UniProtKB/Swiss-Prot annotation:
Residues 85-108, 152-155 are extracellular. The chain crosses the membrane at residues 64-84, 109-129, 131-151, 156-176. It is a multi-pass membrane protein. It comes from the Eukaryota. It is found in: Membrane. The modification Phosphoserine is found at S14. The gene is TP53I11. Its main location: membrane. It comes from Pongo abelii. Keywords: Membrane, Phosphoprotein, Transmembrane, Transmembrane helix. GO terms for cellular component: membrane. This is Tumor protein p53-inducible protein 11. Residues 1-63, 130, 177-189 are cytoplasmic.
Length: 189
């Protein structure tokens, strides 16, 4: 009696098997959308970040605004550190400075924020740009409130202070505008 030989094994070609291909794609994370609506090519690009779509579609004027903000923060910081009397005089029109230390500390804080602004200018990461814009909007908003409260206490009013308040409100609006533009989901084509 001859032993029956088993039938030859058939290789399963996963490339031709639709269910297997779908399972493989799901495991690899290929072609799926994340919470931001971005399609990633692989799990590696999910881990490393995929900002290619954003670099193609930046809000108009964002980099110019980031540059102007960094220059503004740096300039005021250097002025507060080097010339505290002149900065105080420019804002509060001739009021006498009682101590230079708080103004210099303010300059140091602004210099730290300006370093963040300069670094955000060279990144394409949405999250970093949005946090920088939010920091900027909060800073200008707090500065507006502090100057307004100081005006209410002292009763000093001048053209310089009014220009400062109007400019701070404008800067808050611009920063919040870009904050929402950067965070906006791309339109489906």
């Amino acid at each position: 009696m001859a032993a029956k030989q088993p039938p030859p094994l058939m290789k399963k070609h996963s490339q031709t098997d639709l269910v297997s291909r779908l399972k493989t794609r799901k495991i690899l994370g290929v072609g799926g959308e994340d919470d931001d609506g971005e399609v990633h090519r692989s799990k590696i690009s999910q881990v490393l970040g995929n900002e290619i779509k954003f670099t193609i579609r930046e809000p108009l004027g964002l980099r110019v605004w980031q540059f102007l903000s960094a220059v503004l923060f740096s300039g005021i910081a250097i002025m507060a550190l080097a010339f505290p009397d002149q900065l105080y005089d420019a804002v509060f029109d001739g009021a006498q400075v009682t101590s230079k230390t708080p103004i210099r500390l303010y300059g140091g804080a602004l210099l730290s924020i300006s370093l963040i602004m300069w670094n955000a200018l060279y990144t394409a990461e949405k999250v970093i740009i949005r946090w920088t814009l939010l920091t900027e909007a909060c800073y200008f908003g707090v500065q507006f409130l502090v100057v307004t409260a100081t005006l209410a206490e002292t009763g000093l009013m001048s053209l310089g202070i009014l220009l400062l308040l109007v400019s701070r409100l404008l800067f808050v609006v611009i920063s919040i505008y870009y904050y929402y533009q950067v965070g906006r989901r791309p339109k489906k084509a």
